[in-house]
Amino acid sequence: MDLDADFLLLHLSDSALPTGAFAHSFGFETYMDAERITNAEEFQDWLKVLLKVQLTSSDALAMRMFYATPTVSELKRLDERLFAGTPAREIREANARMGTRMAEIVAETYSVPLIVEYLELIQHRELSGHPALALALATHSAGIDVDRAIHAHLTATVSSLIQNAVRGIPLGQMAGQRVMFAMREHIGAAVKRSANLDEIDFCSGDPGLDISQMVHETQRARLFMS
């Protein structure tokens, strides 16, 4: 067992990592405002769609594609495609902020090939930054299996959104934990599903999710930045 690799994975996929994820609902606040998400069950239904469609075809597939071709040119291509394939401005900005912060944390704490170059490209505004790619750089460098890396990233993302729902809807703490436990099989299924996707599936969207994320830009009263 490589304890250093395990530590890196646990550290960088911790939902409490200071990337700013606590400030984003990724559109569920729009459904809250419309009173379509009012309880744990309704939130869980939304979360399953986000995971199955957006997170699987964007974050998970991008990580898998980088692992297949771990080069600077592929990193640039994936970063650009993730940005271009995200319709909602707030989500593009959220990914850029969290991706930049993740890259800064990795560069500060671990010796990872390409991460300094990635961070410089972000800082020079040549790339936008994305947390899934910054994590993939670190996990690939540590020799962590791609499925484990994707599973950890999706778990952390789901956990962050549940924490935001607990204080936003609000939900009880135990209700949030029940949602987290119920999502375990859906996270595993998303990892497996991403292995069967290819280039044509990259950044596949769901009209309802995309529209809710764009509507949030003009929502008058809100707790979250996206």
From Swiss-Prot:
GO terms for molecular function: nickel cation binding. The keyword Cytoplasm applies. UreD, UreF and UreG form a complex that acts as a GTP-hydrolysis-dependent molecular chaperone, activating the urease apoprotein by helping to assemble the nickel containing metallocenter of UreC. The UreE protein probably delivers the nickel. Signal peptide: none annotated. One of its GO terms (cellular component) is cytoplasm. It is found in: Cytoplasm. It holds the Pfam family UreF. Gene3D superfamilies: Urease accessory protein UreF. The gene is ureF. Belongs to the UreF family. InterPro entries: UreF, UreF_sf. Keywords: Chaperone, Cytoplasm, Nickel insertion. This is Urease accessory protein UreF. Induction: By urea and nitrogen starvation. Required for maturation of urease via the functional incorporation of the urease nickel metallocenter.
